[in-house]
C-alpha cells in the first residue's frame, strides 16, 4: 500500500546569528549615532571627505557607551566590517589582545601620513589596563593631526 508522501520539512535556523552590520542594527535611542556612522560609511564609499566644519574632529573620533547588550560591540564590528568591505584598513583593539595594539603602534606613522581612510575600533575602553590606556593615549596623540584615520571607541560608561 502506498502512503502519500509528506512534504519535505526544512530546519528552522534559529541558531544563526547574522554578521553585525549598520543595516541590521536596531538604532532605538541611538539614532543620531547610527545616522552619523551611516553617513560616514557613505562618504568612504563616495571617497568624499567630510566637511571640516561639521565638527572639530571631522567625525574621526567617536566614543559611545551603554550597558552590556546595548549594541556597542555590534556597532564597532559593523563599522570595522564596513571599512574592510570598502578596502580600508581596520585595526580592532580589545583589552584581551595586546599584540594588536603593538602592531598598530608600529604602523601608526604610515597611517597618519596617508590620505586613504583607515579605521581603528577600541572595544571595552573601561577594561583597559594602565599599559593599554597609555597606548591609547599615544595613538590618539599620533592621529590627532591625521585627516584620514578614524577611531571609534566604546565602553560601559560616559567619559568622565
Predicted regions and their residues:
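A short, basic N-terminal segment
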Residues: 1-51
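Walker A/P-loop nucleotide-binding motif
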Residues: 49, 53-76
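Short glycine-rich substrate-engagement loop in P-loop NTPases that contacts/grips substrate
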Residues: 75-76, 80-117, 128-130
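Conserved helical "switch/dimer-interface" subregion of ABC/ABC-like ATPase nucleotide-binding domains
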Residues: 82, 138-142
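Short, glycine/polar-rich helix-capping loops at beta-to-alpha or helix-loop-helix junctions
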Residues: 160
Amino acid at each position: 500500500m502506498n502512503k502519500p508522501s509528506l512534504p519535505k520539512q526544512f530546519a528552522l535556523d534559529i541558531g544563526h546569528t547574522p554578521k553585525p552590520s549598520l543595516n541590521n542594527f536596531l538604532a532605538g535611542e541611538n539614532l543620531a549615532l547610527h545616522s552619523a556612522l551611516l553617513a560616514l560609511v557613505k562618504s568612504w564609499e563616495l571617497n568624499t571627505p567630510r566637511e571640516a566644519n561639521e565638527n572639530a574632529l571631522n567625525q574621526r573620533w567617536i566614543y559611545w557607551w551603554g550597558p552590556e547588550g546595548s549594541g556597542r560591540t555590534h556597532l564597532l564590528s559593523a563599522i570595522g566590517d564596513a571599512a574592510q568591505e570598502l578596502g580600508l584598513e581596520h585595526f580592532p583593539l580589545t583589552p584581551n589582545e595586546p599584540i594588536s595594539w603593538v602592531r598598530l603602534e608600529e604602523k601608526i606613522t604610515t597611517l597618519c601620513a596617508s590620505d586613504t581612510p583607515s579605521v581603528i575600533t577600541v572595544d571595552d575602553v573601561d577594561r583597559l589596563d594602565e599599559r593599554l590606556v597609555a597606548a591609547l593615549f599615544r595613538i590618539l596623540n599620533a592621529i590627532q593631526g591625521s585627516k584620514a584615520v578614524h577611531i571609534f571607541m566604546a565602553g560601559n560608561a560616559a567619559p568622565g
